[in-house]
Amino acid sequence: MTQAAGGTGFPVPGTGRVTVAVPAPGPGQGRWVGAPSAAADPDGGFVVAYRVRITDQRGAATVVARSADGEGLTTVATLDKGRFGAMSMERPAVVRTPEGRWRLYVCCATPESKHWWIDVLEADEPEGLADAEATTVFGGDEHTGVKDPVIRVADGLWRAWICCHPLDEADEEDRMTTAYAISQDGLDWAWQGTSLAGRPGTWDARGARVTAVLPDGRASYDGRATKEENFSERTGLARLAGPDGALVAEGDGPVADVRYLDVVPLPSGGYRLWYEAPLADGSHELRTELID
């Protein structure tokens, strides 16, 4: 059961014109495309990065695409997990720097482990990310896996919301919270503590993963109540509660049965949304939505 966005005015999936941007890579459980991140391109279009998952390969690759309208995507770079020595890949973050270059933050799974880390690549244009050098910026440690970054830069400050998975209990690594970090350059980061965590006894008790933060502090996150709901998270809303990056959940339940929502505000005042949506056969597709 989902709830309306109430008076927050947050652009909620299912309230605009929906288009399938990238179909599922095949029918059935584990064949997923999604976990998108998007940024506005100076030419009026968008750059979108997303993960492709195939059952026997898990997160097989991160794809970078250009789009003139947000709906039709043209692939300009594909980064295979093998390039990073990763067992899997998950949600990337694509960012245009204040200097006009492009960065791609990719999250990678350590083989034979539940650990994750995050690398960054940089190039003059999105096409150049295919061959750019990778540098680790969030390494995690033996106690924590880090993944699914949400990164924003404004007024000379880089801000990151990072999904953290504790590794202290075997078979319980799906638990998740979101931590907050800041940086002057987007490369050297200082952790600021927990930004958002699940609430005991509620729909997000098992974990809370921030997925989008708007310039005015409105935000969205993925949540779930149980271990069994892993990979079937739903979207909830939150808001910034202060200058330290802390977020407070809004409402008593989810607002959409999708996950990995990203939102780009448009010059016209509307929003372009991208998110990962489940299908009845267990596959997932990447959808986009225009909200005027």
Role assignments for model-derived ranges:
Residues M1-D292:
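Carbohydrate-active catalytic/glycan-binding domains of CAZyme proteins
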